[in-house]
């Protein structure tokens, strides 16, 4: 699963997800892409599940690019712990995804195959997504 090798700080504020993605919202590498329509945190496990779904469907053909990286640590407190005594320990990593963000790109396969592979990947994600092609209009 994806996670940073090292970070400057162990813990981060939760932050807010306002507005559209103004970076990472154009197709850069492939011909087909999966674009987020809603804002959400996407965990490293969800990214890996989506990647597996796509690679298993396209088998040996084509290439996949993952355009999001989980670089935000999410902390959790142990179960049945009283409040106070500081922030919990980092449990997992998430990528902050805003509407318009390209999450996955694909190349080297026919459009129907790419569309089905992206549909399978989208089922693993907790947000609404949109299949787009290189010459298509974005959100």
Swiss-Prot record:
The lineage of its organism: Bacteria, Bacillati, Cyanobacteriota, Cyanophyceae, Oscillatoriophycideae. It comes from the Bacteria. Part of the 50S ribosomal subunit. PANTHER family: 50S/60S RIBOSOMAL PROTEIN L16, LARGE RIBOSOMAL SUBUNIT PROTEIN UL16M. InterPro entries: Ribosomal_uL16, Ribosomal_uL16_bact-type, Ribosomal_uL16_CS, Ribosomal_uL16_dom, Ribosomal_uL16_sf. This is Large ribosomal subunit protein uL16. The gene is rplP. SUPFAM superfamilies: Ribosomal protein L16p/L10e. The keyword Transport does not apply.
């Amino acid at each position: 699963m994806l996670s940073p090798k090292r970070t400057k700080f162990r813990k981060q504020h939760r932050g807010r997800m306002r507005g559209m993605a103004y970076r990472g919202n154009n197709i850069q590498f492939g011909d087909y892409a999966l674009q987020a329509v809603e804002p959400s945190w996407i965990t490293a496990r969800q990214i890996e599940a989506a990647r597996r779904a796509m690679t298993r469907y396209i088998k040996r053909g084509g290439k996949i690019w993952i355009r999001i990286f989980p670089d935000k640590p999410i902390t959790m407190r142990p179960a049945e712990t009283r409040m106070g005594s500081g922030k919990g320990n980092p449990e997992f990593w998430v990528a902050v995804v805003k509407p318009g963000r390209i999450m996955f790109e694909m190349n080297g396969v026919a459009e129907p195959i790419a569309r089905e592979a992206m549909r399978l990947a989208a089922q693993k994600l907790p947000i609404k997504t949109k299949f787009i092609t290189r010459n298509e209009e974005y959100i």
